[in-house]
């Protein structure tokens, strides 16, 4: 890399460094900058219950998730057998992707600026979805809100869960960080 080239920095990561970190240091009086909560990873999960009867449904879900995240999904398998669902231990029932570093920041930027505004009747994310340890989870009911998904080629609508994992020790720290980043969490 020559001296004139600049290193790629995700837009949301730059915002985190320039706006979120100083705001959190001021609000919570951190003595050490390493105490400031940061995003560790984002896990995107698609549960495909229909995969028990039709494995093609799972293959299509994997294709959708690969297009949305830009990363090869991992197949998730049943941990227990459930006779009511005709499910055996070890059967494939979903897929997930773990995003870190630049791909995590780019995906979160895409969710905030493109996907969530396209959700029908969107009134903001639930503020009670924090887990008590600073992590935040929410769901998106339709994969078609992402621009990578071609609406005409969708065989059925599938939802997904998105879990934002942080180093925050409390929900208040994580709430302030995610709000400053631009995540549209509605008021309590």
From Swiss-Prot:
Q: Which InterPro entries match?
A: Ribosomal_uL5, Ribosomal_uL5_bac-type, Ribosomal_uL5_C, Ribosomal_uL5_CS, Ribosomal_uL5_dom_sf, Ribosomal_uL5_N
One GO term in the molecular function aspect is: rRNA binding
Q: Provide the disulphide bond pattern.
A: none
A biological process term (GO) from this entry: translation
Checking Pfam families in the record gives: Ribosomal_L5, Ribosomal_L5_C
**Domain of life the protein comes from:** Bacteria
* Keyword tags: Ribonucleoprotein, Ribosomal protein, RNA-binding, rRNA-binding, tRNA-binding
Q: Which GO terms describe its cellular component?
A: ribonucleoprotein complex; ribosome
Gene3D superfamilies, alphabetized = 3.30.1440.10
Q: Describe the function of this protein.
A: This is one of the proteins that bind and probably mediate the attachment of the 5S RNA into the large ribosomal subunit, where it forms part of the central protuberance. In the 70S ribosome it contacts protein S13 of the 30S subunit (bridge B1b), connecting the 2 subunits; this bridge is implicated in subunit movement. Contacts the P site tRNA; the 5S rRNA and some of its associated proteins might help stabilize positioning of ribosome-bound tRNAs.
Q: Please state which protein family the record places this protein in.
A: Belongs to the universal ribosomal protein uL5 family.
Subunit structure, interactors included: Part of the 50S ribosomal subunit; part of the 5S rRNA/L5/L18/L25 subcomplex. Contacts the 5S rRNA and the P site tRNA. Forms a bridge to the 30S subunit in the 70S ribosome.
Protein name, entry field: Large ribosomal subunit protein uL5
Q: Which gene encodes it?
A: rplE
């Amino acid at each position: 890399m020559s001296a004139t080239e600049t290193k790629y920095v995700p837009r949301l990561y730059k915002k985190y460094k320039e706006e979120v970190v100083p705001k959190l240091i001021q609000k919570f009086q951190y003595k050490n900058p390493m105490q400031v909560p940061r995003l560790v990873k984002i896990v995107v999960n698609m549960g495909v219950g229909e995969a028990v009867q039709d494995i093609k449904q799972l293959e299509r879900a994997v294709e959708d998730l690969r297009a949305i995240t830009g990363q090869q999904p991992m197949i998730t398998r049943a941990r227990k057998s459930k006779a009511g669902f005709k499910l055996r231990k070890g059967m494939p029932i979903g897929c997930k992707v773990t995003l870190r570093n630049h791909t995590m920041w780019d995906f979160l930027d895409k969710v905030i600026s493109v996907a969530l505004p396209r959700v029908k009747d969107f009134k903001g994310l639930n503020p009670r979805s924090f887990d008590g340890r600073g992590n935040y989870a929410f769901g998106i009911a339709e994969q078609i809100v992402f621009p990578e998904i071609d609406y005409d080629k969708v065989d059925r609508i599938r939802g997904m869960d998105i879990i934002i994992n942080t180093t925050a020790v409390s929900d208040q720290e994580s709430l302030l960080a995610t709000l400053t980043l631009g995540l549209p969490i509605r008021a309590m």
